[in-house]
């Protein structure tokens, strides 16, 4: 079986699966990866000749990590005279180990300059070290307990008291990448669909944008890393424009489709995995603008949308499919004013704030090897606080306007998944900084194009880069 049936907790001496009962030159390999929960296991032969399943790094991955690679090297590379490896770098000539770096030669002299028998018992097998139990308080009883409290079972690997490094399955990163991509795929702000600087009162706006985003980060306590590329097409149109006593109210509908692809690697693991999300979206939006023609003064923008997703995780272990669905709602406010200037161009400053509530219900999934992938919660809140500065021409507000926006992004979304009830975190930083550079201008009297590039950074090696192209047609 390729599923250990548990959460995949840390092992010290490994799980014995083949007992040789003597010497054998046979070399065993796994027919397919063995995974328990989030962790991946491999076969290692110990110095007793038996084979064990362990989740640990190998020398080729990290030279500083300990290994038992079938040649029976054990941490210190030093011989315990019984044929057993001893981490202390000390030779035990009679089968009895004295951890102080001194040989106990059977005559029970402690070569560190201390004579055994100063009230200390050396009973042949043996307790030693000046009244202290041999080997850090551990009995070496011939077969033998050794090295800091770890059992050296007559030729078995002694792990030096340190748990073997665990190796995560790369599928973990693919599941985490899919989960975050589905949550964020259709989240947007007003500028994504409506950056117009001039509109007649009765103008309706039909719009379409395409955006791409690439992001990468480490997850699972730095045991897995992944990158995700997302592409989204969103189309919408106003169906109402209503002047009010103060300002103007516009409303419309929208729909969209998107795809996200994730590539995941696990530390100390030669395998990789891929994730894929195909998403679809329908929603409504409404905007109140204080100035009826120009984007000046205050505004309030709201939208709500329902989305559904088809998710896949593929690797050389399994191909998995599962579904998710959810909805999101946003409230955004801002206020723009012009810096007075006698120059032809001047700056328009627009502070913005936005809060998005997101709910995503991902079905609990059990893969072909029995690993259960479940969510911990369904809802999350995203926040944004920023300032947009546009450099515009005072006598012709429809002329091309370059702009820069700086945002503080708050909230990482639902960041965790459970694999056989063991939680693994996406490690997406809760706080991130974002910089956007863009330009907006008219192609003709009724059509406007906007181009934007963005970068986003945070802890845990998190980085994201994006591009956005928007077409608006007023009619």
Walk through the language-model features, giving the residues of each:
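Outer-membrane translocation/initiation segment of Type V secreted surface proteins
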Residues: 3-246
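Short glycine/proline-enriched turns and hinge-like loops at secondary-structure junctions
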Residues: 9-10, 225, 344-345, 398, ...
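Outer membrane beta-barrel translocator domains of Type V secretion systems
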Residues: 156-341, 453-454, 459
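Outer-membrane beta-barrel strand-turn architecture
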Residues: 200, 241-245, 290-294, 337-343, ...
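Transmembrane beta-strands of outer-membrane beta-barrel proteins
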Residues: 206-208, 249-253, 282, 296-304, ...
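Flexible, surface-exposed loop regions and adjacent strand-edge segments
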Residues: 224-228, 268-274, 316-323, 366-373, ...
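Outer membrane beta-barrel transmembrane domains
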Residues: 243, 280-283, 372-475
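Detector for outer-membrane/organellar transmembrane beta-barrel domains
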Residues: 322-338, 342-416
């Amino acid at each position: 079986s390729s599923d250990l049936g548990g959460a995949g907790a840390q092992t010290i001496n490994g799980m014995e699966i083949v007992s040789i009962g003597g010497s054998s030159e046979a070399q065993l390999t796994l027919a397919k990866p063995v995974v328990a929960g989030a962790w991946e296991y491999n076969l290692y032969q110990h110095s007793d000749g038996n084979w064990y399943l362990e989740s640990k790094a190998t020398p080729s991955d990290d030279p500083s990590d300990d290994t038992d690679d079938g040649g029976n090297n054990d941490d210190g590379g030093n011989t315990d005279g019984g044929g057993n490896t001893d981490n202390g770098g000390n030779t035990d000539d009679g089968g009895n180990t004295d951890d102080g770096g001194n040989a106990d030669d059977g005559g029970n002299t402690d070569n560190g300059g201390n004579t055994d028998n100063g009230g200390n018992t050396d009973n042949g097998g043996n307790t030693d070290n000046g009244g202290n139990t041999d080997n850090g308080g551990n009995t070496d009883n011939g077969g033998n307990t050794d090295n800091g409290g770890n059992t050296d079972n007559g030729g078995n690997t002694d792990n030096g008291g340190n748990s073997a490094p665990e190796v995560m399955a790369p599928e973990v990163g693919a599941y985490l990448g899919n989960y975050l991509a589905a949550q964020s795929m259709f989240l947007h702000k007003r500028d994504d669909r409506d950056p117009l600087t001039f509109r007649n009162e009765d103008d309706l706006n039909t719009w379409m944008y395409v955006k791409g985003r690439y992001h990468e980060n480490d997850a699972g306590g730095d045991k897995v890393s992944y990158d995700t590329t997302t592409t989204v097409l969103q189309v919408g149109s106003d169906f109402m424009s209503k002047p009010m006593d103060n300002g103007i109210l516009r409303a419309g509908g929208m729909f969209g489709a998107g795809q996200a692809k994730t590539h995941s690697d696990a530390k100390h693991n030669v395998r990789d995995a891929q994730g894929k999300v195909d998403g679809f979206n329908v929603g409504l939006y409404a905007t109140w603008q204080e100035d009826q023609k120009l984007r000046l003064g205050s505004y309030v923008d709201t939208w709500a949308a329902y989305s559904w997703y088809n998710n896949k995780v593929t690797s050389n272990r399994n191909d998995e499919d599962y579904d998710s669905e959810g909805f999101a709602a946003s409230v955004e406010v801002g206020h723009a004013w012009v810096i007075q200037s006698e120059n032809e161009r001047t700056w328009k400053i627009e502070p913005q704030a936005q809060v998005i509530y997101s709910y995503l219900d991902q079905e609990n999934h059990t893969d072909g090897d029995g690993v259960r992938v479940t969510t911990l919660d369904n809802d999350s809140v995203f926040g944004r606080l920023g300032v947009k500065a546009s450099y515009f021409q005072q006598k012709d507000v429809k002329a091309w306007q370059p702009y820069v926006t700086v945002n503080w992004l708050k909230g990482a979304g639902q960041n965790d998944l459970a694999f056989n009830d063991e939680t693994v975190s996406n490690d997406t930083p809760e706080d991130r900084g974002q910089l956007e550079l863009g330009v907006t201008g008219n192609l003709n009297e009724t059509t406007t194009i906007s181009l934007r590039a963005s970068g986003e950074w945070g802890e845990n090696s998190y980085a994201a880069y994006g591009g956005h192209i928007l077409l608006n047609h007023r009619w």
